[in-house]
Amino acid sequence: MNTLENTFQFLAEVFEANGGCLVTERVSPSLSGASKRKSRPVKRIITEDEVIPEEEVVEEEEEEKVEQPSEEVTCPAMQVDATDAILASLRQIANNDLSEHCIREDEGNTSAEVFSNGNGEDMEQAGLAGTDLLRRVADMLQGNHNGSLNSHFLQQQFAAFKETVDPTPVSTNGNGLLTPITTQLSPLFTSTDAFNSPEKLLQAIMTPSLGFLGANGLGASNSGLLSSPLIAPSPTLLQSLMNTPTQPTASLTPKKAENRPPVVSQTLKASKRRLFDDTSRIEAASMSGDDRIDMNELEAFAQTFKKQRIKFGFTQGDVGVALGKRYGTDFSQTTISRFEALNLSFKNMCKLRPLLKEWLADVEMAIEGGATVTDLIDKKTIHNGNHHTIHHVDIHETSISNSISSVTASSLLSREQHVKRRRKRTNLDMNQRNALDTFFALNPRPDHDKMTDIANSLELDRDVVRVWFCNRRQKMRRVDEPIEGEMVTPSVSPVFPHFSSMSALEQIQEAARLASCQASNDDSDGTSGSPDAPSNDGCSDL
């Protein structure tokens, strides 16, 4: 057995004496001493003629030993069963020192390297005498007077022990080579990335479930005296983690979004302005002299309009609705926003500027007269039907002269004639859709008079009916279905010769009866016993 194993065996025998407590015996001065030399026999004066047998001498020595009463003294520093913990910690310290000086650990490797000679025996550590190790262990046990052994005390002793001892590894496997055995960590271990601060590392070491120091927090196991604890990280890894400052890593810390520098924003604005000036110059060259507006004046009005709109409390959507009620054309919120940001074409901005300027002037005068924003939004200013009736606050509620008001009214009426009115989307009910489907089945291309009769019978506009027939024919072309009467559309249907002489109501009734007959015909075909049997559709009188 080597020196290190003899040392551990000695400690085990000492601690086994009284259930894990350190026990010493007070013996005679002849048996006590600093060294472990054997007791000397009692000196006696023996003559040459007197012969004392050897058995007698042995008996006298045994009697002396019995006469000395033994007294057990328990170490006050060992009040708990910590034998396994100390032995496992010492074994772990020695093994970690050997592995640290023998093998260069790979960077980022979380597995522990254990060296073995293949015979289950620990490797001998040269340069560490048995007496030196015993003396250091005794000093460690006697230096802790508070009655407890914790991990902090063991770490301090281990640091002092490591500074003074520089072991030199010696192989005992007979080949002169050390065989590294890589063993993966227990699944109870967590990743070393979680121990980025000394506080977290110490907390993890003191946690029994992680298994850094064993089941009882000191690296020992209750299964046996010299049972090996769980595999723990190497001292180099723990020391590097302890010395690592607490700093958030770059990968885990999200970078703060950098604001756009003012130089870039100014460059974008300048390029946007140059693009607007170029397009405006090209469009202004093609415009007449009356409609041409200076670009600087247009930009100044856009800024003024935005400030006044915000001052009065109007949103961009409110301005679009108010312009739609005033001039009969709906303006979306996007249009007003693009006008304020100079994102519209120069020609469209020139057309929209007079409308916004007049609306802004009317709103300013109405608010000065005591009107509220809600009243101005809810006020109806559009025309009813084909009768153009324009209501102006500045004409009826202010003291402007009659000449100015007449000029304003006439200019608005003339401008309304040039504004394109957008037709509202027509929603057809179920009866109107069914009637149009029936008419389309009879004649997909009705002439002008037929289309007018259909529109009057369904109480729809003729343009709505015309667009519906056009869309339906386009839909039928997309699905590649044949359309009856595509080439020639006579004024009188050959199937129903008397159809043209009917009124609109009679035509709808006849079309509905035809549809019901077709449905009954389909039902009779589906329930007939023979597919070749003639079916009675009930429409033979036609």
Swiss-Prot record:
It comes from the Eukaryota. The keyword Nucleus applies. Residues 243-264, 514-542 are annotated as: Disordered. It is found in: Nucleus. Disruption phenotype: Viable, but some animals exhibit sterile and lethal phenotypes including hermaphrodite sterility, embryonic lethality and larval arrest. Defective ovulation and terminal differentiation of oocytes, which result from a delay or an inability to complete meiosis during oogenesis. Defects in gonadal migration. Defective sheath cell differentiation in terms of cell shape and position and defective functions which include weaker sheath cell contractions. Abnormal hypodermal cell differentiation. Defective MAPK activation in oocytes in the presence and absence of sperm. It holds the Pfam family Homeodomain. Residues 243-252, 517-530 have a biased composition (Polar residues). GO terms for biological process: determination of adult lifespan; epidermis development; germ cell migration; negative regulation of oocyte maturation; oocyte maturation; ovulation; regulation of transcription by RNA polymerase II. Residues 421-480 bind DNA. Keywords: Developmental protein, DNA-binding, Homeobox, Nucleus. GO terms for cellular component: nucleus. Directs gonadal sheath cell differentiation and function. Also directs gonad migration and plays a role in specifying the differentiated phenotypes of epidermal cells during postembryonic development. Plays a role in oogenesis, regulating a sheath cell signal that causes oocytes to maintain diakinesis arrest during meiosis. Negatively regulates oocyte maturation, ovulation and MAPK activation in oocytes when sperm are not available for fertilization. May be recruited by akir-1 to the promoter regions of antimicrobial peptide genes to control gene expression in response to fungal infection. This is Homeobox protein ceh-18. It comes from Caenorhabditis elegans. The gene is ceh-18.
